[in-house]
């Protein structure tokens, strides 16, 4: 305010007519205080014919401009502006303190709250703070400002405490997990001071138990609630419901819920949230149906949590019905509800409807943007994901966070967008998210999918905090690239750093042992799975069955499978694969019947194992029947399915059918393997025409393939074309000089795996260990041969 305008205001207020109104004088005092003219404010105050409590509140504006310890603050005390408090009734003094404290409502005004508290004390209003009413509001003021330590100090200095005093702290502790453990020691003081708890007391204490996940203390409180007659209080019972749900005791929660007479929306919501939190999604949706049948109207929060359940369950039809009900019921959609709808459509793969919902959101927040970007990425719309990410960058707010980058990076994992992923990696580094575990895991997945293990290792090395998800990504990534030995090493290193393994990491490392035929190392991980209780997890069970099956111990695989309580299809497929690998066609087919009897729909893996079994045994008719059955069920055949069928009909000499299958197979470099199988069959059947055509197709893909030249030489030989045989032999000799040596590995000395090649003398220790193992195998063979001779001679 300028000097001129202030003078005009003073001239008006100092008229006799204006002086009769306290309202005018109160505003004049407030104006002088804001302009730091405290002496003028005191003069107006002294001349006031009528003073009320608002006069004091006008002076309280000084706290917005004057800090503790300043000269102006000292001047206030010197002028005695607050001495009027001594001439006010006690109830008005308490009310004035309360009104001042209620102006402090967040942590941003904590300094002002302390100034109010100190100024009231130093101005002589200490008598007011002896009132529990004033002190309780001081406690609430500090709680609202986020200073629970200061609130406790006020509580401890109170000469008289009542139930409201205790409830103020209980409520604060129940909302702050770091302070929740301080609540129960207070109950001893409460009992000592003969303060009787009420419904609010029990509600807050039960919420503390939920925060601490202390179901025993919660049950004890529930007994007191029943004893003191609060079991009919809906608010108290709802808090007990929430406590049991948070602690995972859904049976006790259901018993309490059944005893609640007047169930409101909060009680129903608590049961729905508890079911979803404990992965009982179907039960949560059933509670929602019962809620509707009971006539209780769902709230926006109800719709949001139920839609989240539909997202987790992938229940698209139910999600659509809930969306329709929201529209019909004229419920005013808020941002959390819109985000829940958006997440549901993204999770269920309906991106068209997801974009419609996103477009109707008036002011989408970062959760909205992250949901639409993640939905595009997860549903194969990588280009749209990047477009939405660029749109977000063009906006001033909100700014992308680690979840945004993770979703965008996932969209660039495909080879055609990999270059964008590298650019995003640069942005992540620039903005300081490179050490985020969430972003790091996505970067690892992107690099491994593009076969850049070294780049993935660099990302991993930057991470300071490595959780089990990050380690598992390294294990799975190396396993998929065929680096099974590295996968095992990473698991061992993870375990040494005291990271707890989970079912996914164990199943991945057991799969790596299976690929490398490292049975002894796999048995060690089997023991670890039993010790940690993950042997009951279906992914681990399937990996164990697969490992023992591939290593020739199908009986052990059968034992593990029989111990599984509710094996899933993956576990069934693993056992079926064990029978297939050993050519047990009859057992495989019988096991297939059991799969059908148990209500499972066979998938591509199921039929692959069956076709492989038929291929091993040469069961052509059975294989053709299964092939046609698979196609009738709409299961798309992959390369391995075609490989089994080509091998099967080629062994039977049906080269024309094999040629037809190859031409139907998906194109790619893998087709060379199919053509090579056909070429080998043509050698056996002396079919020169199809054989030459097969060789031509292989050499288009790999002109220097030695195996093809050898097969082609054999084809010429069986057809008597010796000049062509000689020509092929000359080519083979030229190719042999540039051929890369094959590698082998052997497991020796307690799970130590050594890699070597033919004639390799580079590592004497490896040569010695391999030679010792070879000698051991020879001795075993000689002993077995001698035993057989002894048995036969007898």
From Swiss-Prot:
Residue segments, region Type E(+) motif: 751-782
Positions of region (Type E motif): 674-749
InterPro entries: E_motif (IPR046848), Pentatricopeptide_rpt (IPR002885), PPR_At4g14850-like_plant (IPR046960), TPR-like_helical_dom_sf (IPR011990)
Repeat positions for PPR: 131-165, 166-197, 198-232, 233-263, 264-298, 299-333, 334-364, 365-399, 401-435, 436-470, 471-501, 502-536, 537-567, 568-602, 603-637, 638-672
Signal sequence range: none
GO BP, sorted A to Z: RNA modification
Keywords: Repeat
MF terms (GO), sorted A to Z: RNA binding
PANTHER family: (WILD MALAYSIAN BANANA) HYPOTHETICAL PROTEIN, PENTATRICOPEPTIDE REPEAT-CONTAINING PROTEIN
Family: Belongs to the PPR family. PCMP-E subfamily.
Name of the featured protein: Pentatricopeptide repeat-containing protein At3g50420
UniProt organism field: Arabidopsis thaliana
């Amino acid at each position: 305010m300028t000097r001129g305008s202030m003078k005009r205001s003073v001239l008006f207020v100092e008229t006799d007519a204006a002086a009769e109104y306290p309202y005018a004088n109160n505003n004049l005092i407030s104006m002088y205080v804001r302009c730091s003219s405290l002496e003028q404010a005191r003069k107006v105050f002294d001349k006031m014919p009528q003073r009320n409590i608002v006069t004091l509140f006008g002076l309280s504006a000084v706290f917005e401009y004057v800090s503790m310890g300043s000269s102006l603050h000292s001047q206030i005390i010197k002028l005695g502006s607050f001495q009027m408090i001594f001439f006010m009734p006690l109830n008005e003094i308490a009310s004035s303190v309360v009104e001042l404290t209620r102006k402090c409502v967040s942590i941003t005004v904590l300094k002002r709250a302390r100034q109010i508290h100190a100024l009231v004390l130093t101005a002589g209003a200490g008598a007011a703070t002896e009132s529990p009413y004033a002190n309780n509001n001081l406690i609430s003021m500090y709680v609202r400002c986020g200073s629970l330590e200061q609130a406790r100090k006020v509580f401890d200095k109170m000469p008289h405490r009542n139930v409201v005093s205790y409830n103020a702290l209980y409520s604060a502790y129940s909302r702050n997990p770091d302070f929740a453990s301080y609540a129960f020691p207070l109950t001893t003081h409460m009992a000592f001071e003969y303060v009787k708890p009420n419904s609010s007391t029990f509600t807050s204490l039960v919420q503390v138990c939920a925060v601490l996940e202390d179901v025993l203390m919660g049950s004890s409180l529930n007994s007191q609630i029943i004893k003191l007659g609060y079991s009919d209080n809906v608010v108290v019972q709802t808090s007990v419901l929430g406590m049991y749900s948070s602690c995972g005791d859904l049976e006790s929660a259901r018993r309490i819920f059944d005893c609640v007479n007047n169930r409101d929306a909060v009680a129903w919501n608590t049961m729905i949230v508890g079911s979803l939190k404990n992965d009982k999604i179907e039960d949560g949706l059933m509670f929602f149906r019962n809620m509707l049948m009971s006539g209780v109207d769902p709230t926006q929060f109800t719709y949001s949590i139920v839609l989240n359940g539909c997202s987790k369950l992938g229940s698209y039809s139910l999600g659509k019905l809930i969306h329709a009900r929201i529209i019909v019921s004229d419920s005013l959609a808020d941002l959390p509800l819109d985000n829940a709808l958006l997440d549901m459509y993204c999770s269920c793969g309906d991106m068209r409807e997801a974009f419609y919902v996103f477009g109707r959101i008036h002011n989408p927040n970062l959760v909205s943007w992250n949901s639409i970007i993640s939905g595009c990425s997860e549903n194969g719309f990588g280009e749209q994901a990047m477009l939405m990410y660029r749109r977000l960058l063009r906006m001033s707010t909100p700014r992308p966070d680690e979840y945004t980058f993770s979703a965008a990076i996932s969209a660039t994992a495909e080879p055609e967008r990999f270059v964008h992923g590298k650019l995003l990696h640069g942005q992540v580094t620039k903005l300081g998210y490179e050490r985020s575990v969430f972003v790091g895991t996505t970067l690892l997945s992107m690099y491994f999918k593009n076969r850049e293990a070294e780049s993935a290792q660099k990302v991993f090395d930057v991470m300071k905090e490595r959780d089990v998800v990050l380690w598992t990504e390294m294990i799975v990534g190396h396993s998929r690239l065929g680096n099974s030995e590295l996968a095992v090493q990473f698991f061992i290193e993870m375990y040494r750093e005291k990271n707890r393994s989970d079912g996914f990491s164990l199943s991945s490392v057991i799969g790596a042992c299976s690929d490398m035929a490292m049975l002894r190392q796999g048995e060690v991980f089997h023991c670890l799975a039993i010790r940690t209780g993950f042997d009951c997890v279906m992914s681990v069970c399937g990996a164990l069955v697969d490992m023992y099956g591939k290593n020739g111990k199908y009986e052990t695989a059968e034992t593990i499978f029989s111990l599984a309580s509710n094996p899933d299809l993956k576990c069934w497929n693993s056992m079926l694969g064990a029978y297939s690998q050993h050519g047990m066609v009859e057992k495989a087919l019988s096991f297939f019947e059991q799969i059908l009897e148990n209500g499972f729909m066979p998938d591509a893996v199921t039929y692959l194992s069956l076709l492989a079994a038929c291929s091993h045994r040469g069961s052509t008719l059975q294989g053709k029947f299964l092939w046609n059955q698979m196609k009738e069920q709409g299961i798309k055949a992959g390369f391995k399915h075609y490989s089994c069928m080509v091998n099967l009909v080629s062994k039977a000499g049906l080269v024309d059918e094999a040629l037809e299958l190859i031409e139907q197979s998906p194109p790619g470099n893998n087709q060379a393997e199919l053509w090579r199988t056909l070429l080998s069959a043509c050698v056996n059947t002396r079919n020169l025409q199809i054989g030459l055509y097969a060789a031509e197709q292989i050499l288009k893909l790999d002109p220097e393939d030695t195996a093809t030249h050898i097969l082609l030489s054999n084809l010429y030989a069986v057809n008597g074309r010796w000049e062509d045989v000689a020509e092929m032999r000359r080519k083979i000799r030229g190719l042999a000089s540039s051929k890369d040596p094959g590698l082998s590995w052997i497991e020796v000395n307690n799970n130590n795996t050594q890699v070597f090649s033919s004639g390799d003398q580079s590592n004497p220790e490896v040569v010695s260990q391999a030679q010792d193992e070879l000698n051991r195998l020879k001795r075993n063979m000689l002993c077995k041969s001698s035993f057989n001779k002894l048995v036969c001679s007898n």
